[in-house]
Curated annotation (Swiss-Prot):
Motif JAMM motif, chain ranges: 171-184
Domain MPN: 101-222
Protein name (Swiss-Prot/TrEMBL): UPF0758 protein TM_1557
Biological processes annotated in GO: proteolysis
One Gene Ontology term of the molecular function aspect: metal ion binding
Annotated positions binding Zn(2+): 171, 173, 184
Pfam family, one: UPF0758_N
Keywords: Hydrolase, Metal-binding, Metalloprotease, Protease, Zinc
InterPro entries for the chain: MPN, RadC_JAB, RuvA_2-like, UPF0758, UPF0758_CS, UPF0758_N
């Protein structure tokens, strides 16, 4: 990216002033690298962001196909962009979670913030030591838009492999309402019973959503 009418373009600005000096539009333009015939890469970046309401969260949650469908983007640019966004997510996890002690449901909710905006249900098993420090985690299932599947066998296989003393099971409600369903309550009871048999404590089952969370432990249901 060269100078445009005397103005420093994104790559030059990053070299001179660092990445924090760039707007989101400019950062996305660097990832896209090139525009298309008749459209500068900064214009393409603007079009792409506008397609997802200017929200990095919506852009991050979009599928490759949805991103690639923006005129001028295509699959190659979409793949590069998704990879960059995923690296950002993983960096956030490293910065915010390690080390981490999950001794309250509020901390669990903050720990799993990336789950609350997903459009599909996922189930995460967080493995803990005796002091409630995180020693591992695993995403078990990706459900449909309105249900997920949690099987005690899979939950405690993860716990045993991590040599965990306890586990916290977390899943999201894409609807935005964290209120547990009848199925959620049933699986919580099954997980509790299985944990008692195996000697691995079910520390909590937490449902997270955009409007908050529900903790079975906090509500006295565990």
């Amino acid at each position: 990216m060269k100078r445009d009418g005397g103005r420093l373009l994104p790559r030059e600005r990053m070299i001179k002033a660092g990445p924090e000096s760039l707007s989101v539009e400019e950062l996305v333009a660097i990832v896209l690298r090139t525009g298309k015939k008749g459209k500068h890469v900064l214009e393409l970046s603007k079009d792409l962001l506008e397609r997802f309401d200017g929200s990095l969260i919506k852009l991050s949650n979009a599928s490759l196909e949805e991103i690639a469908s923006v005129e001028g983007v295509g699959m190659v640019k979409a793949i590069t962009l998704k990879a960059a966004l995923e690296l950002g997510k993983r960096l956030h996890r490293e910065l915010e979670r390690i080390p981490e002690k999950l001794d309250s449901s509020v901390k669990v909710y903050k720990y799993c913030q990336e789950m609350v905006y997903l459009e599909r249900e996922i189930v995460k098993v967080i493995c803990l030591d005796t002091k409630l420090n995180v020693i591992g985690e695993n995403t078990l299932t990706v459900g449909t838009s309105d249900r997920s599947l949690i099987h005690p066998r899979d939950v405690f296989r993860t716990a045993i492999r991590a040599n965990a003393s306890g586990v916290i099971v977390v899943h999201n409600h894409p609807s935005g309402d964290p209120t547990p369903s009848k199925e959620d309550r049933l699986i919580t009871e099954r997980l509790k019973q299985a944990g008692e048999i195996l000697g691995v404590s079910l520390v909590d089952h937490v449902i997270v959503s955009r409007r908050g969370y529900f903790s079975f432990r906090e509500e006295g249901e565990l």
